[in-house]
């Protein structure tokens, strides 16, 4: 009987110790984050617990790309950022911009890689705080996004295979009846529609694939923004950008935009206010856009 009582008491003791240990562990895990940066960013910093999480493709040079090391060839003063949950790194225009914003706010930067087709799902799921990747306003996105200030102003171009007769075309009307494609889930199909009677082929997931299809002759023409087209031509010399005359080129469709703007989930006014203040604080303007896009193009690996 005494042995049974002792065993019972011993068992109860073990349970109590386990509960106490679990409680202690939880308290240690729940150590409150304390922000020590600039007061104007404190509310947002506490919201994100000191980590600015940014969603980008890491496959959209020169805005962003994936590389195996943190080194930037020819620029020892620069380093690529690690991709969350991966052994790879990323760099490009988005990373330059994000790092400047994170540093201004006194936050750690964390880059999350996601395919363009599902990048908004990651934002909705709370995997990251904002999306960049050259994203722009659209009526559909406006139903679930709030926008920060412009971080790049783009214009759009046509790429064709080098040596093709289309290389010398200077007016949209000359591309009549040709085979076109562009990246999926963008507003570029509205630009293709400005060409007379285009043959629109299926849209691939990335601009890199568009460049490849043009280079291989699977399509006659691809439509994308100038930096991405220029970057693609550096990587693939079999593709060139057509020089379209002003007044005979693309116009921004009604209700569309060519202003690239980082965006957060709708209703997150704390994030919008803080990010706007940070962009103002770092003096982001057209000169910044030109300077850092030039740097991104210069540092892009030719394999991207």
Model-derived features: where do they sit?
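Ligand-binding clefts/hinges and TM-proximal coupling segments of bilobed small-molecule sensing domains
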Residues: 27-34, 187-205, 241-243, 274-304
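A ligand-binding cleft/hinge motif common to bilobed small-molecule-binding domains
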Residues: 118, 134-144, 191-194, 215-216, ...
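Bacterial N-terminal signal peptides that target proteins for export
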Residues: 2-10
